[in-house]
Amino acid sequence: MVYVLALLIGVIAGLRTMTAIAAVSWAAYLGYLSLDGSWLAFLGYRFTPWILSALALAEFVTDQLPFTPSRKVPVQFGARILSGAISGVAIALPGGTWVGGLIAGAAGAVIGTLGGAAARSRLATALGRDLPAALVEDAIAVVGAVLVVGLL
């Protein structure tokens, strides 16, 4: 089950880079995910979830801007994979299976990045505009992250 959750949080990172890691940070801060004593303990620190949430909100805004680069360019793609990998490790770490979590989270980020781009493109074409498609993607990312964290 832990690998499925790591994969799913990776998919969320593929949709929205900061949403996945912000959700994991909230889980650690609220005590749903024990990262104490690990190199990821900082995710549960007092201000970390607030900072990551602010960054996630900023990402929601900048994603709507016309000059924002594609999620498939190397820097954007790499950031999503890194976020998915770290989030996957955080989910798997309490069980001692961090390598599997890293792989599952990174793989999920690739799936989320490519699948999310394709789905959003089709939805934007169907709706005639990108903004509604982007907002649907935002909602899926947030609800998905909450559901994954809720299953921890």
Enumerate the predicted regions with their spans.
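Alpha-helical transmembrane segments and their juxtamembrane interface "caps"
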Residues: S25-W26, L30-S34, L43-T62, Q76-R80, ...
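Core segments of transmembrane alpha-helices
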Residues: E59, A79-G88, E137-V142
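Cytoplasmic-side transmembrane-helix entry/capping segments in multi-pass membrane proteins
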Residues: S70-L82, A104, R129-V136
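Mid-bilayer segments of alpha-helical transmembrane spans in multi-pass integral membrane proteins
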Residues: L82-L93, L102-A118
